[in-house]
A protein has these predicted regions:
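Alpha-helical transmembrane segments of multi-pass small-molecule/ion transporters
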Residues: 1-212
Length: 212
């Protein structure tokens, strides 16, 4: 649970922020900044949590090793995207509508394929860790919304920050879990959270789209 809680948001939050009529520019900026910082922060949180909770890290692996793997999984794609955006600004801007539509289609295809292909595992994951994943996800969404309400004046920013808090980078969490532990049980909360967050976030988007 600490692994998925420590994981930064992913690009999914950018797509859903667009669906929710939120502040997309803020969402992209937050994703980029947090992804860069996560290389240092996530290993620190996970290693300290494992030590505090008395969980044995079964593999001989260092924080530096994990940080380097995270750099290639999270940071490199962000840097690459920023470089492409700066070099091809006019082209990207002219194709914004097409890119947005493709993002919608790809998101829906991934969402549906996960449920169709992994249905047997989904039942197992939800049974074992669904409740804690749901509580964590909803807590982060509401905390993000009301913290943003206190600090910002715009509803678009509140939508954005709620989704940034509620949506985690499941791929990164799986990478960290598989690198540190040999037992698949440590991946169950991550898998359950990924399934829960997609579902709750879609409902959240449908609700907040009506709020202006």
């Amino acid at each position: 649970v600490m692994i998925i809680a420590a994981a930064p948001g992913g690009v999914t939050s950018n797509i859903l922020t667009k669906f929710a009529d939120g502040d997309v520019a803020l969402s992209v900026s937050l994703t980029a900044i947090v992804s860069l910082l996560s290389v240092l922060i996530v290993p620190l949180i996970v290693f300290n949590s494992a030590d505090f909770l008395g969980v044995e890290i079964t593999k001989e692996i260092s924080m530096l090793n994990i940080a380097m793997k995270m750099f290639f999984v999270v940071t490199v794609p962000v840097i690459f995207g920023m470089i492409v955006r700066s070099l091809m600004t006019d082209f990207i801007v002219s194709k914004t509508l097409i890119i947005q539509r493709l993002s919608v289609i790809l998101f829906l295809l991934v969402f549906i394929s996960i449920y169709v292909e992994e249905w047997d595992r989904i039942v197992s994951f939800i049974t074992r860790a669904g409740l804690i994943a749901f509580i964590l996800n909803m807590t982060m969404i509401f905390v993000g919304y009301y913290v943003a309400k206190f600090w910002t004046s715009g509803i678009a920013q509140r939508k954005c920050i709620s989704l940034e808090c509620g949506l985690q980078n499941g791929t990164l969490a799986v990478v960290v879990a598989t690198q540190l532990f040999n037992d698949i049980v440590y991946m169950v909360p991550t898998a359950a959270y990924a399934l829960v967050m997609f579902t709750t976030s879609i409902f959240f988007v449908l609700i907040v789209r009506k709020i202006n």
